[in-house]
Regions:
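Iron-sulfur (Fe-S) cluster-binding segments and ferredoxin-like electron-carrier domains
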Residues: 1-2
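Conserved AdoMet/S-adenosylmethionine-binding subsite of the radical SAM
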Residues: 7-23, 32-178
Length: 201
């Protein structure tokens, strides 16, 4: 919630009071909709919490607007003591172009760990060869494939649904096409569960 420092302070107070919290996740909406100075304020305050070790940022914005990865943003991540992980949301190899690759190179240069999560979508990427090309292009860009999600059964998205049996067939074929470290974990998020449910890894 960009600009809402009162809410942020409540979250900071909670994190500071719970020493078991080692990682903070910036997630959606999209955290990179916030301005660099807003992110800087929040990260500087997180740095002051001694038990925090890692910052994870989930975002799709660099795929749509690669120019969002500004020099100021990269400097902010370079200077933080927190180990920073960025998880991009890319579903098809055609989403990766040279402008996006350059933005990721800037993040690599400041030691940001880059991961990707995709959603398996009927008619978009429900083909092992497409997923292999996606993994190859991600890795060439410095991004490690992390998760391949089975689509949540939500209203209005049924035309993208793939059966679990089909998904497993696609996944097994993908495993035969590329190196193990380029095969993302096949998973589903189930409401009420604290962690993703893994179908294969």
């Amino acid at each position: 919630n960009p600009g809402n420092k009162k809410s942020w302070q409540l979250a900071l107070d909670y994190i500071a009071a719970h020493s078991e919290i080692e990682e903070v996740i910036f997630s959606g909406g999209d955290p990179l909709m916030a301005k660099d100075h807003e992110l800087a304020w929040l990260i500087k305050h997180l740095e002051n919490i001694p038990h925090l070790q890692r910052l994870r940022i989930h975002t799709r914005l660099p795929v749509v607007i690669p120019q969002r990865i500004t020099d100021e943003f990269c400097t902010l991540l370079a200077e933080t003591r927190l180990q920073t992980v960025m998880v991009t949301h890319i579903n098809h190899p055609n989403e990766i172009d040279q402008i996006f690759a350059h933005a990721m190179q800037k993040l690599n240069a400041v030691n940001v760990t880059l991961l990707n999560q995709s959603v398996l979508l009927k008619g978009v990427n429900d083909d092992a060869q497409i997923l292999k090309i996606l993994s190859d292009k991600l890795f060439q860009t410095g991004i490690l494939p992390y998760y391949l999600h089975l689509l949540d059964k939500v209203q209005g998205a049924s035309h993208f649904l793939i059966s679990d049996i089909e998904a497993m067939q696609i996944y097994k074929t993908l495993q035969s096409l590329t190196s193990g470290y380029l095969v993302p974990k096949l998973a589903r998020e189930i409401a009420g569960e604290p962690n993703k449910t893994l179908y294969a890894e």
